[in-house]
């Protein structure tokens, strides 16, 4: 019980520090303004036509479109780059007291902040289209029309989703896969960032996320040379675009959902093992 109480205290302390930073508020406001400007008067377009669109479809679009996806992941990297928060003398204190409770507190915080971040993205999209929203699990005809003619719905920016994927899977199936991948990518980014801080206390916390964003940009935007093709199989942020994943094991061009889950699971387990080993040693300072 004492260990659980200490762990909860560390989680609470991390959230207090995160919310007390002006950076967090700025990121949340920037995301809200970005999506508002990006989708324009989408609510007005839907109300004028008397149609409704699925919230799951909107979430799939923003996570599959490279520009909105870049924005989402950059915001997440900027929030998570401070994990774990470092105080002078805290590690020496932990060596004599609750090292495991501290470690579990950091892990729970990273998982929780990942869930909250994407819940916030989901809420922003919901506010953009309410009350013209539906929660049906199948693809809506409105979504198909919006892909073909986004200007008719007040959207002046890029709005697209692969129709070939829509013919093979339902919106609910793809949404579930997208949520799983986003959660795993977020946790992997947080754990790798935390591992970097534990191995290199004075190192740049944004390095892990920065490298991931650069890999994603090279694999999806630059697309120069053979390396860009192979980067799709090792770039975690690229795997969040479920519309670009292969739907068959015989397609060697893009990774499958199963491969992405296994790869990301490895990215989660490796830093956890390293951190568990590091926190148990008395040379951690």
Where are the language model's segments positioned?
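Membrane-interface helix-boundary motifs at transmembrane edges
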Residues: 18-19, 100-101, 196-202, 280-281
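Aromatic- and glycine-rich beta-strand/loop motifs that create alpha-glucan
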Residues: 1-27
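Junction motif at the cytosolic side of a transmembrane helix
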Residues: 192-199, 265-285
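Transmembrane helix boundary and interhelical loop/hinge segments in multi-pass membrane proteins
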Residues: 79-95, 99
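Secretory targeting signals
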Residues: 35-83, 104-198, 233-262
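Aromatic-anchored segments of alpha-helical transmembrane domains
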Residues: 32-39, 211-222, 239-241
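Central hydrophobic cores of alpha-helical transmembrane segments
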Residues: 28-32, 203-217, 234
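Interfacial transmembrane-helix starts/ends
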Residues: 11, 15, 19, 100-111
